[in-house]
């Protein structure tokens, strides 16, 4: 009798998302004039995380629609305003051709990381994440 090996453990959504945010930060697409692409990627990464972690239809919802959906979950209230600001700035860069300043790009990445860690229960141990 052949016994099938157990499936590999699932990688938690916050780990995947933090890796994606780190890769996006390393690429710094805004430095190559790709601000729209940066904000499209940032928004997609966060929305995918919200779908996986909180089972809300974030990919097909507007920013305005996402926020009330998250209130019905265990998403931390204190992170709502930060998330909304990052998604709003992403929307403005993508749709209104109104990109934030270069300093805002790094801040939005920082805030995205902060939202993910606060909403996942993740306890930072890596020095990159300890000062959030």
Label the model's feature ranges:
Residues 29, 54, 62, 102-105, ...:
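Short linear functional motifs in flexible/disordered or boundary regions
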Residues 26, 47, 51, 117-121:
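Non-catalytic alpha-helical coupling and interface elements of nucleotide-dependent molecular machines
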Residues 72-132:
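Cytosol-/stroma-facing membrane-proximal "stalk/adaptor" domains immediately downstream
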Residues 24-27, 52-53, 73, 96:
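Alpha-helix C-capping/helix-to-loop hinge sites
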Residues 34-85, 89:
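Short, charged amphipathic alpha-helical segments flanked by flexible coils
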Residues 14-17, 63, 80, 109:
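Alpha-helix initiation and N-capping motif
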């Amino acid at each position: 009798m052949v016994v099938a090996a157990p499936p590999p453990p699932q990688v938690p959504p916050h780990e995947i998302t933090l890796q994606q945010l780190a890769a996006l930060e390393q690429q710094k697409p805004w430095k190559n004039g790709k601000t729209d692409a940066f904000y499209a990627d940032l928004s997609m990464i966060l929305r995918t995380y919200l779908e996986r972690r909180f089972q809300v239809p974030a990919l097909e919802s507007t920013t305005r629609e996402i926020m009330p959906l998250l209130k019905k979950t265990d998403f931390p209230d204190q992170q709502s305003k930060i998330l909304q600001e990052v998604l709003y700035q992403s929307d403005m860069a993508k749709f209104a051709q109104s990109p934030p300043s270069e300093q805002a790009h790094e801040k939005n990445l920082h805030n995205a990381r902060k939202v993910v860690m606060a909403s996942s229960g993740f306890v930072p141990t890596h020095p990159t994440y300890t000062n959030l």
